[in-house]
Each structure stands twice: as C-alpha cells, then as structure tokens.
Amino acid sequence: MRLNAPQDFKRCFLSRKRIKNVAFTLHYVENSGQIARLGVNIAKKKIKKAVDRNKIKRAAREAFRKGHFKGIDIVLILKNEKFYDQTKCFKMINEVFNDLMKR
C-alpha cells in the first residue's frame, strides 16, 4: 500500500527514526494497523527524466514488497543524484531496506 496523504509523510518526518546511506534516506514510523505503507520521494530537480525516476520507484516498491513489513509507514527519499547508476541505485535501495529489517 502507498502513503498518499501529506499528513502521513509529515508524521514520518517528525518521528526522527531514519536510516541513511550515500544515496537515500529512509524515514519510518510504526502505524496502528497491520498494513505497511510506502512513500517514495524523488525530486525532478535531482533526476530529470521521468523514466529514470519511475525505475527507482519501481525498485523501491519491489524491495518493500519483498521485505514483508507489517505495521510501519516508510518514506524513501533520494538525497544524492550523483550516485544514480541503475545497478548501484538498486543495490543501495536493497541495502537500506535490509538495514530496516534488522531493526
């Protein structure tokens, strides 16, 4: 399921729980339900082509789906476009989600 409402994004940012790597920041907060939700934020300023932004979003959704998370809201933000190479980017996304599963 996806995060859509601005107040849900705000709640994740205010929780101060986050995981960082070179290219991404992942904010998370527990929610009251049993459903995990994901929001992906990739600025057009950082990745110009919509095709590339969508590839990153699809990779994030796939890593999220494979993680089998329950009762958590997650927001993934691209913070550094210099590291945008498709294979590196997908590895970094998986790395961030694996770190979250360990916590």
Predicted regions and their residues:
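Positively charged, solvent-exposed patches that mediate nucleic-acid binding
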Residues: M1-R103
